[in-house]
Amino acid sequence: MERIKELRNLMSQSRTREILTKTTVDHMAIIKKYTSGRQEKNPSLRMKWMMAMKYPITADKRITEMIPERNEQGQTLWSKMNDAGSDRVMVSPLAVTWWNRNGPVTSTVHYPKIYKTYFEKVERLKHGTFGPVHFRNQVKIRRRVDINPGHADLSAKEAQDVIMEVVFPNEVGARILTSESQLTITKEKKEELQNCKISPLLVAYMLERELVRKTRFLPVAGGTSSVYIEVLHLTQGTCWEQMYTPGGEVRNDDVDQSLIIAARNIVRRAAVSADPLASLLEMCHSTQIGGTRMVDILRQNPTEEQAVDICKAAMGLRISSSFSFGGFTFKRTSGSSVKREEEVLTGNLQTLKIKVHEGYEEFTMVGKRATAILRKATRRLIQLIVSGRDEQSIVEAIVVAMVFSQEDCMIKAVRGDLNFVNRANQRLNPMHQLLRHFQKDAKVLFQNWGIEPIDNVMGMIGILPDMTPSTEMSMRGVRVSKMGVDEYSNAERVVVSIDRFLRVRDQRGNVLLSPEEVSETQGTEKLTITYSSSMMWEINGPESVLVNTYQWIIRNWETVKIQWSQNPTMLYNKMEFEPFQSLVPKAIRGQYSGFVRTLFQQMRDVLGTFDTTQIIKLLPFAAAPPKQSRMQFSSLTVNVRGSGMRILVRGNSPVFNYNKTTKRLTVLGKDAGTLTEDPDEGTAGVESAVLRGFLILGKEDRRYGPALSINELSNLAKGEKANVLIGQGDVVLVMKRKRDSSILTDSQTATKRIRMAIN
């Protein structure tokens, strides 16, 4: 009060008023304002006040050589007075106008490259289609979404290194560009931005937009890929939505989508192999998505989906601490529980051993089409508030929550036996047994659950066992809400462990994920997925298995041939022959294998019966565990194209056709590759030509190591000896000649020598 009186008193004196209104603000005030590092309290006032001055801008001295002192109207553009406290010139806003009209014009060629993300956005919007506006209640839930279409997926640190390398290549500082994507981007950008005159800082900001994924936690109803998020403000309000089809796709959305499909295929395939974890890792490491190694994408891409997270866990990467059940992501928001094993009886009197969670807990459940809040105690559902896009989605959420609650009335609602199996034909664990059972038909479950009268609460409504809404009654504890439940925003990642059956656990031993949680939904990937692993051959059906198996043999023929003669058992056990077995009728697999192995043994024993084409053709059949029998076959059956097709033991067939003239193999009419060596028997001449420059010393001598193929001989030094595998599948010892003169006679003597050495 006192101070206000004092101020009033001062203001009543005319001298005070004069001082405050007439005196110019000295530069000290401005310097103080600049240098005291406080947040600007009134930016708009400050701006107006600065711009009201004659020279609000300071510029480098060089500006005086580039801009005249006065413009055409005779107005002063810069002051001869130096800016106090710096050696810069004070400049009028009119100088900016002059520069824009008369300043030098630089090349605009770099603009579209620097502002790439903006130019692309304009194109997408130009070609996008906006549909009708619908007025309806919007169930929005906050989700972590990608707000920056068209970016690469580098981490902030990786991007920083790339930007420094591109924009400030000569700056000091350790920069290590390791990942493939970093190197590719750096090279590409350096080329694009040669002679670029745009300010480096601006270039750096724009590059950041292009390289790093930016996510925000936004309320969304509808599409969550980045090309939808960029028009979120145009497509959904509080009570309306506008239909929109993007005018283009961006690679980051395609990568996310294709990654999910690849991960699902790999987890499903690994789950049925003998060692799921090893198989999964082998497949992740040998798969490419859109030309980039899948493991590189997994390291950089933050997509959270069950299969993707299983792959990440296998690679030792951190994943989200929420767990998955019935396709919903559960996040505990309060409470705690301990686990205890308990035996329970189903309505069919089948005994189930379930791990009961004892204690009060609250969860958020987030699925693709429905969300819920669940409060539960030990084997009791207290409250479930669901919201979903349609009735079907709401049913799914209720079933999952009821099973998860482990209530007795749910277990007693089971009719019939529970014997669901996974893809590897192993019984599912009890909780998933119950889930599958009620997902098939929830009628009894809902009927047995019980109903209760409800209070009228804003935005909530009851739901009856037959899924009709009601304001009077509802299934016990269950309510349907108009509002969605937000996804869990915390993006913390935790260290997890994974066992060989691909069950992922947190450090307290709670199972977060298992292959049962991986969706069976099939989609078509946007980017090409290349699975190099033989385990994925069957993804495109039996024909692909057949073609891929033979392609593999032909590609690796040099090593296969040596193993065939020296270590056949190891060859038969190769995992590349595993998928082929599913094509051979089960009842006869063993006989085929025994027959082919015997045939091969005869080839090894009897000189001159080595037949490349026949070995390639029959080899996959030898991989099954053999049954000894006297049976002979003239053709072998494989199940492709919905029926049994025959492969002739001698000669060509539609399934396996080798053209001697072109040396091309076609399998079911598809090209399976070219044989690089002549598989015809009567051609000892080929060997003799190849062995020119080598002396044949006699039979194989194990002291000189494993047999080399003819192609590998060229590496020998003069006078060096080695065993070599020749066309008939026999091994002889040779020495590289010390002199070149006698080479001509080699080819004539080679043929005789080979015969002698073998006999």
Curated annotation (Swiss-Prot):
GO terms for molecular function: RNA binding; RNA-directed RNA polymerase activity. Its main location: virion. The gene is PB2. One of its GO terms (cellular component) is host cell nucleus. It comes from the Viruses. Plays an essential role in transcription initiation and cap-stealing mechanism, in which cellular capped pre-mRNAs are used to generate primers for viral transcription. Recognizes and binds the 7-methylguanosine-containing cap of the target pre-RNA which is subsequently cleaved after 10-13 nucleotides by the viral protein PA. Plays a role in the initiation of the viral genome replication and modulates the activity of the ribonucleoprotein (RNP) complex. This is Polymerase basic protein 2. Influenza RNA polymerase is composed of three subunits: PB1, PB2 and PA. Interacts (via N-terminus) with PB1 (via C-terminus). Interacts with nucleoprotein NP (via N-terminus). Interacts (via N-terminus) with host MAVS (via N-terminus); this interaction inhibits host innate immune response. SUPFAM superfamilies: PB2 C-terminal domain-like. GO terms for biological process: 7-methylguanosine mRNA capping; cap snatching; DNA-templated transcription; symbiont-mediated suppression of host cytoplasmic pattern recognition receptor signaling pathway via inhibition of MAVS activity; symbiont-mediated suppression of host gene expression; symbiont-mediated suppression of host mRNA transcription via inhibition of RNA polymerase II activity; viral RNA genome replication. A motif (Nuclear localization signal) lies at residues 736-739. Belongs to the influenza viruses PB2 family. It is found in: Virion; Host nucleus; Host mitochondrion. Keywords: Cap snatching, Eukaryotic host gene expression shutoff by virus, Eukaryotic host transcription shutoff by virus, Host gene expression shutoff by virus, Host mitochondrion, Host nucleus, Host-virus interaction, Inhibition of host innate immune response by virus, Inhibition of host MAVS by virus, Inhibition of host RLR pathway by virus, Inhibition of host RNA polymerase II by virus, mRNA capping, mRNA processing, Viral immunoevasion, Viral transcription, Virion. Pfam families: Flu_PB2_1st (PF20947), Flu_PB2_2nd (PF20948), Flu_PB2_3rd (PF20949), Flu_PB2_4th (PF20950), Flu_PB2_5th (PF00604), Flu_PB2_6th (PF20951), Flu_PB2_7th (PF20952). The record marks 627 as: Mammalian adaptation.
